[in-house]
Amino acid sequence: MGVEITIIKEGKGNIPPVGSNVTVHHAGTLTNGTVFDSSRKRGQPFNFKLGAGQVIKGWDEGVAKMKVGETSKLTISPDFGYGARGAGGVIPPNATLVFEVELITFK
């Protein structure tokens, strides 16, 4: 599957080019609804360099198609997420992940 994108709220303007620094708010859940991460709960957005492999492949591909101000649901298959290894004892092996991501800005 890779990454499936469902737009929740339309954004405006351009999409971020590969190599840009993007700032997002996100909430990550398992398909059973268990929340495993939330930048809003921490009160701080998350920054990363798009396309540099700093995040899972599903994020690099999904966020690259978003516009500033857009909020989308990214449904990410295990091969575009953490795969057979899972992550940090929180994400089980071969888990499909669901992220609600808001692209705040890029530069």
From Swiss-Prot:
It comes from the Eukaryota. InterPro entries: FKBP-type_PPIase, PPIase_dom_sf, PPIase_FKBP_dom. The keyword Isomerase applies. Inhibited by both FK506 and rapamycin. Its EC number is 5.2.1.8. It catalyses: [protein]-peptidylproline (omega=180) = [protein]-peptidylproline (omega=0). One of its GO terms (molecular function) is peptidyl-prolyl cis-trans isomerase activity. GO terms for cellular component: cytoplasm. Gene3D superfamilies: 3.10.50.40. The keyword Isomerase applies. Residues 19-107 form the PPIase FKBP-type domain. PPIases accelerate the folding of proteins by catalyzing the cis-trans isomerization of proline imidic peptide bonds in oligopeptides. Belongs to the FKBP-type PPIase family. This is FK506-binding protein 1. It comes from Dictyostelium discoideum (Social amoeba).
